[in-house]
């Protein structure tokens, strides 16, 4: 009942029996319980709407065939044959969901569901969302994870060289990689490409796929913004069979075709006397070629380039990490084009 000492101006005769202050304690508790139940009902209705827009499954077993892409993450050739890749981490998965890439499924701890719900709801396709504890997911994939957020995306169909040339306004800027097999370095190079406005990445037949999990992770999801041409690989041949565009058989032939279209092909080579970086001209259409840190650019690819250019360094340093070298070359290109 009312506490006259606390509420001196309260008049029970005027307020009526519906005043919370005048209600008996048990009736007040009952009203609070009803409110809690009503809020829970509204939450359940909202959750049901989410489930209708994308499928949610709580998983507790590794046996589901839909989870195989996550269980086989250490077998990348299987993913390449299926034309899929795995995105790992909150930022990378978010960028995948924001991209035009098709998404098959998402796996995450339940605490992340509300974070990703708007992005998943906005997708044109229905996505299956698997919920599980992070420790369970680590057992599924076979390694420790910081956030436990993963997604399976679909590698897009190959893009032809003619398509890229038609869609890229001048001055064109492409990057090609030869024998770059380290996925982390390839991912870092992709990130630099997007940062400096590269219009396409050409991946040679002896390089790793930029859609390997570690490459995608190190690119921080920027691979979803960069058109990729893969030449002369079995994975490219499989995907090319799904469309009529011919696939080039080698990086050296692709570079010759670029030169025929007026692009200057410039090899980033640490041991050349031809020209140093500040003397090279990047102001017009060009393709910059990078090789592996161990073996550099192959002879056949070097011969297909117009010239080789070096970053000047003291004798004690024979080369830079390919990601660092790409950043230096691409910054110089941006500077010459007035974009730096």
Model regions and ranges:
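A glycine-rich helix N-cap at a beta->alpha junction
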Residues: 125-141
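Active-site/ligand-binding-proximal alpha/beta "capping" segment
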Residues: 266-316
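Short, aromatic/basic amphipathic alpha-helical patches
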Residues: 114-126, 301
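Structured adenosyl-cofactor binding patch, chiefly the S-adenosyl-L-methionine
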Residues: 148, 192-196, 210-223, 299-340
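Intrinsic disorder/low-complexity segments
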Residues: 1-53, 167, 229-253, 260, ...
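RNA substrate-binding interface of SAM-dependent RNA methyltransferases
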Residues: 98, 152, 161-275
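Boundary-proximal intrinsically disordered activation/regulatory segments immediately upstream
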Residues: 51-111
């Amino acid at each position: 009942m009312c506490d006259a000492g606390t509420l001196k101006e309260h008049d029970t005769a005027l307020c009526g029996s519906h005043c919370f202050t005048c209600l008996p304690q048990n009736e007040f508790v009952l009203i609070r319980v009803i409110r809690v139940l009503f809020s829970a009902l509204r939450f359940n209705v909202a959750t049901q709407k989410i489930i209708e827009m994308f499928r949610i499954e709580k998983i507790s077993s590794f046996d589901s065939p839909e989870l195989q892409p996550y269980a086989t993450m250490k077998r990348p050739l299987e993913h390449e044959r299926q034309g899929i890749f795995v995105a790992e981490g909150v930022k990378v998965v978010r960028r995948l969901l924001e991209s035009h890439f098709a998404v098959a499924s998402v796996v995450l701890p339940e605490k992340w569901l509300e974070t990703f719900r708007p992005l998943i709801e906005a997708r044109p396709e229905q996505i299956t969302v698997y919920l599980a504890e992070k420790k369970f997911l680590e057992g599924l994939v076979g390694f420790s994870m910081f956030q436990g957020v993963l997604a399976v995306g679909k590698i897009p169909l190959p893009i032809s060289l003619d398509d890229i040339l038609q869609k890229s306004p001048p001055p064109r800027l492409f990057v090609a990689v030869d024998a770059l097999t380290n996925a982390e370095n390839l991912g870092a190079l992709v990130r630099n490409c997007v940062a400096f406005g590269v219009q396409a990445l050409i991946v040679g037949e002896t390089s790793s796929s930029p859609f390997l999990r570690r490459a995608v992770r190190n690119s921080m999801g920027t691979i979803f913004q960069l058109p990729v041409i893969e030449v002369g690989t079995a994975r490219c041949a499989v995907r090319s069979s799904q469309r009529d565009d011919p696939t080039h058989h080698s990086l050296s032939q692709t570079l010759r075709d670029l030169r025929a279209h007026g692009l200057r092909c410039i090899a980033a080579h640490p041991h050349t006397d031809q020209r140093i970086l500040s003397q090279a001209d990047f102001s017009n259409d060009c393709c910059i070629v990078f090789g592996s840190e161990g073996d550099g650019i192959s002879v056949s690819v070097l011969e297909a380039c117009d010239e080789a250019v070096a970053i000047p360094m003291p004798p004690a340093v024979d080369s830079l990490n390919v990601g660092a070298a790409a950043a230096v070359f691409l910054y110089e290109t941006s500077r010459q084009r007035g974009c730096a």
